[in-house]
């Protein structure tokens, strides 16, 4: 028998105790539910290079379908983008990335900055472009291959990009190694002696130094892409520029989810959106590169954005990266 006054085992006491638990338990759940709602991601961040372009309509479509706000973080050229993602991998600055290409993919893989697969989004052929008007006005025959750029005829006419920070720059360096073998170092020495200009990134080279885009630059030959002439079609229906389509380097750009992302599901949703017909159809006119899916291309591309007639590749690029960059630095720095 319980002591007098102790009614803890009586039906009334048990009923009261259960009632108290029922009242307290929902109250304990409320903060947990609210906390879960507060941490639900509402934004997805993508780190990319400065040349990434996406229309307001595409942004609105993604945000409406996903319920997420898209934040774009631009980080310079491809090399700078890759290096910054490596440096910040312990505290990722974004959820997804776009713009690491096959020349810098090895760096990303070695440093394990990507969670899952690299999704190919677009491709382009790194080729030299020249200003047709300049050569017509000057009465000079334009080059037919990058191998001719060491000729004195083209002294001081060419602008390229730094292979340490620029993916087109590294692609061209790889092209010379693949095509010339051990003679690539001699080629670069001759190119420097021919007063080639080196810029840090493609945008500076193309939009500032090249005479064929804005018409304000001093250099009529630029390292760019086979598709770039499609962006320079004038009112007369002709492109002011043309591309040298032999011995180009095929560049593929990837997107993916960053390891340690705060919103990996949102990042994956963004990558899938970039593979949709809606996004892929916009790629040519937004970024002047080729989509990876079989979507219809703009009519002008058949005439002004012809893919390279021949390409070169350097499968051992990742293994020889430091070696060939060191050789390049010894010549230019």
Name each model feature, range by range:
Residues 1-44:
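Short, low-complexity disordered leader/linker segments with a strong preference
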Residues 37-107, 214:
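Early extracytoplasmic/lumenal segment of secretory-pathway proteins
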Residues 92-97, 111-130, 146-148, 156-163:
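A structural signal for short loop-to-beta-strand junctions that line the ligand-binding cleft
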Residues 102-112, 120-141, 169-179, 252-256:
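Periplasmic solute-binding protein
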Residues 153-164, 273-297:
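Periplasmic-binding protein-like
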Residues 175-246:
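Ligand-binding pocket segment of bilobal, Venus flytrap-like solute-binding proteins
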């Amino acid at each position: 028998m319980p002591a007098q006054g102790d009614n803890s085992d009586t039906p009334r006491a048990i009923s009261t105790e259960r009632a108290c638990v029922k009242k307290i338990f929902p109250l304990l759940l409320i903060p947990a539910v609210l906390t879960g709602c507060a941490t639900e991601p509402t934004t997805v961040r993508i780190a990319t290079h400065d040349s990434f372009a996406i229309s307001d309509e595409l942004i609105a479509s993604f945000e409406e379908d996903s319920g997420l706000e898209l934040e774009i973080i631009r980080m310079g050229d491809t090399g700078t983008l890759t290096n910054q993602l490596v440096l910040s991998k312990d505290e990722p600055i974004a959820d997804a990335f776009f713009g690491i290409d096959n020349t810098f993919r090895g760096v990303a893989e070695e440093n394990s900055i990507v969670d899952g697969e690299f999704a190919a989004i677009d491709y382009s052929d790194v080729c030299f472009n020249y200003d047709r008007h300049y050569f017509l006005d000057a009465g000079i025959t334009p080059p037919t291959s990058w191998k001719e750029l060491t000729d004195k005829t083209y002294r001081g006419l060419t602008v390229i990009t730094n292979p340490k920070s620029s993916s087109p720059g590294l692609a061209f360096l790889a092209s010379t190694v693949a095509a010339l073998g051990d003679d690539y170092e001699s080629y670069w020495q001759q190119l420097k002696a021919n007063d080639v200009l080196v810029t840090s990134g493609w945008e500076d080279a193309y939009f500032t130094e090249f005479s064929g885009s804005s018409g304000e630059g001093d250099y009529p030959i630029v390292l760019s892409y086979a598709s770039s002439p499609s962006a320079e079609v004038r009112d007369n229906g002709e492109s002011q520029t043309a591309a040298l389509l032999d011995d180009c380097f095929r560049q593929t750009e990837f997107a993916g989810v960053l390891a340690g992302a705060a919103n990996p599901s949102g990042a994956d949703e963004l990558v899938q959106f970039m593979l949709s017909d809606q996004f892929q159809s916009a790629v040519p006119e937004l970024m002047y590169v080729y989509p990876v899916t079989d979507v219809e291309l703009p009519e002008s591309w058949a005439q002004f954005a012809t893919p390279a007639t021949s390409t070169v590749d350097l499968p051992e690029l990742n293994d020889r990266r430091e070696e060939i960059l060191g050789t390049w630095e010894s010549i230019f720095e």
